[in-house]
């Protein structure tokens, strides 16, 4: 076993241990959070038109991408090593290029699952709010997933591990080897982190836990991004764009359900006032 293989093996074990410790620690923090429920504010509400548009958009993006991926040949999946040379990769992406590591791949998938499960903390809210929060989260995931899937379909980029001799041949057979941009795990992780942070800070503006929730959510999302690079699945620019897409959707969808957003479309009340003066009759109409 070479020095680099030993280093990768050691890193994999340590990251796996860290993943377990974070999971246990998160459980303890969640218990404390549930024990001290802060004052709740109701900033979000559903709207038939608004949610019809967002659910429809998310379903259309994700559904059409799935259909095109399975039944329409968008990409040429024939692999030619001569087409993919490390020297053609931008310098800042070369720095983080790594061969494939299955252990780190698995740990990265685990951190993604943890971030996506983070909104479970909103069980501390009144049950009457669960439908609103749940609907917003479904919209967030559908839109974020649809955007990253369509980008993957339209952008032809080999994954970093394909530039190394020991690339996984099963990935080549699956046709996933040229879907590097953007990082799907990172997109969904940051969407979950941004959603959790936005909703918690809006619903519990005076809570001392909001910084911890934001830090833990984005910290786990960032760990996912690092693991996706370390496992050889993505370049730096893949995870960067994925983080931007996920964060944008994660913040935008909850905002589009706030009273602040709805107030911009409320019509001002129309009132009329009539009065009789020595000079005659006057009528004032406010709109």
Name each model feature, range by range.
Residues 32-116, 154-169:
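N-terminal transmembrane-helix/juxtamembrane module of multi-pass inner/ER membrane proteins
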Residues 103-107, 134, 138, 183:
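Hydrophobic alpha-helical transmembrane segments of multi-pass membrane proteins
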Residues 110-114, 120, 132-141, 146:
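Acidic/His-rich structured neighborhood in mature extracellular/periplasmic domains
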Residues 120-126:
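Conserved, well-structured interaction surfaces
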């Amino acid at each position: 076993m070479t020095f680099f293989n030993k280093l990768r093996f050691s890193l994999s074990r340590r990251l796996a241990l860290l993943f377990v410790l974070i999971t246990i620690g998160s459980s303890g923090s969640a218990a404390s959070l549930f024990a001290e429920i802060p004052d709740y504010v109701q900033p979000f509400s559903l709207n038939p038109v608004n949610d019809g548009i967002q659910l429809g958009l998310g379903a259309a993006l994700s559904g059409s991408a799935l259909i095109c991926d399975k039944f329409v040949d968008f990409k040429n999946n024939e692999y030619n090593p001569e087409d993919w040379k490390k020297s053609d990769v931008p310098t800042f992406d070369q720095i983080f290029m790594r061969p494939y590591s299955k252990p780190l791949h698995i740990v990265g998938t685990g951190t993604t699952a943890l971030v996506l499960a983070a909104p479970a903390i909103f069980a501390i809210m009144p049950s009457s709010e669960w439908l609103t929060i749940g609907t917003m989260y479904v919209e967030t995931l559908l839109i974020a997933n649809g955007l990253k899937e369509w980008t993957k379909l339209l952008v032809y980029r080999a994954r970093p591990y394909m530039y190394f001799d020991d690339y996984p041949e099963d990935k080549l057979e699956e046709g996933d080897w040229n879907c590097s941009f953007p990082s799907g795990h990172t997109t969904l992780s940051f969407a979950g982190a941004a959603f959790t942070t936005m909703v918690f800070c809006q619903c519990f503006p005076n809570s001392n836990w909001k910084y911890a929730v934001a830090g833990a959510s984005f910290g786990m999302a960032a760990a996912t991004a690092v693991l996706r690079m370390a496992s050889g699945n993505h370049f730096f620019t893949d995870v960067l764009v994925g983080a931007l897409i996920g964060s944008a959707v994660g913040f935008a969808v909850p905002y589009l359900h706030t009273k602040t957003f709805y107030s911009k479309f409320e019509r001002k009340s129309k009132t009329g006032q009539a009065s009789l003066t020595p000079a005659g009759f006057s009528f004032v109409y406010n709109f």
